[in-house]
Design a protein with these regions (language model features):
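Extracellular beta-rich repeat passengers
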Residues: 1-121, 143-144
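Active-site and glycan-interaction determinants of carbohydrate-active enzymes
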Residues: 125-144
Length: 144
């Protein structure tokens, strides 16, 4: 998934959800080419009986101005699992919205080196020795 001129979060609108809510974000590649204040995930249900969140084996990358952007906003989380998530070297947001241990691990390579053709939206992993490739992180479509 790549975001270009996105003005809302990638996942949002959970405010009116009721009952048990399970959200799993797994084996995805997210590349933000969006405005500076982009939010990746706005997960704020108000009336759920339980909210279980799993975020694992994802790759996050893109362009974000210093001091801008949010990774997660969450509310009323019953349980959460964050594991094996990575971000390309140099990709940061102002507000990760999670505990320090849950922030994605920074890769050795920046997106321009890790991906085949960022401008052409070809996010094939070019370095077969990179931690992203060897650990199978992100969308399997880009790990060839």
């Amino acid at each position: 998934f790549h975001a270009n001129n996105l003005t809302r979060a990638l996942i949002t609108g959970l405010g009116s959800m009721t009952g048990e809510l399970n959200v799993t974000i797994e084996n995805c590649t997210f590349v933000s080419m969006a405005p500076a204040a982009m939010t990746f995930f706005d997960l704020n249900p108000k009336n759920t009986s339980s909210f279980h969140l799993v975020v694992r084996n994802n790759l996050f990358s893109g362009v974000c101005e210093v001091g801008q952007g949010t990774w997660f906003t969450t509310r009323n989380v019953t349980s959460k699992t964050f594991e094996n998530n990575y971000r390309t070297n140099g990709f940061v947001v102002a507000n990760w919205g999670v505990d320090a241990a849950e922030i994605p691990v920074e890769t050795t390579l920046p997106m321009e080196t890790l991906f085949k053709d960022v401008a052409g939206r070809d996010f094939t992993i070019t370095d077969k020795n990179s931690e992203v490739y060897t650990n199978g992180i992100g969308d399997p479509h880009w790990i060839k």
